[in-house]
Amino acid sequence: MSECTHDCSSCGENCSSRTQPQDLREKPHPLSKIKKIIAVVSGKGGVGKSMVTSMLSAQSNRKGFSTAILDADITGPSIPQVFGLSGQAYGDENGILPMKTEKGISVISLNLLIDNVTDPVIWRGPIIAGVVKQFWTDVIWGDVDYMFIDMPPGTGDVPLTVFQSIPVDGIIVVTSPQ
């Protein structure tokens, strides 16, 4: 038996020093209970992710499920516009409350937190990824049957952060015939 290097991922030994990989998943807000999480992704912009996210959420809501949308497209949020939401979400020391659509779908988006929705959001990847994590950990979602996450286009920091830190149950890939 050789000396332990504590690099368990490349070691074939089954010893008592073996450590489990670190779990990077974040816990949702303590007042949130989310049953299923579906991410809506694409390789490029303009293919209809936000529309697919909105329609899936609306259809699930019509079938009697409690639904929510986490708008992770921080630099191009469009979910509030799809549902006609305006104004700002309310928050206090307990957390942030998502806004509700006319039919009761819970929505959180950067557009519901900033003063002027026409101002561009020019943030670097780690800041944007941190905001998405905060949407998961700081928003009081309540009891939700299906949460749909509207992702930004591509495979950058935000999708990687979401897939590492949020326990996604399924992924829907939106494409266009080009």
State what each model feature region is.
Residues 49-54, 77-80, 151-159:
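Short glycine/serine/threonine-rich phosphate/pyrophosphate-binding segments
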Residues 115-158:
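Cytosolic-facing regulatory segments adjacent to core modules
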Residues 29-35:
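Phosphate-binding P-loop
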Residues 37-74:
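Walker A/P-loop phosphate-binding motif and the immediately C-terminal alpha-helix
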Residues 66-67, 72-118, 129:
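Phosphate-binding loop that captures ATP/GTP phosphates
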Residues 145-146, 152-178:
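Conserved catalytic-core segment of NTP-binding enzymes
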Residues 1-27:
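Cysteine-cluster motifs in flexible loop/terminal segments that predominantly coordinate metals
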Residues 34, 45, 71, 79, ...:
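Residue-level signature of catalytic and energy-coupling elements of molecular machines
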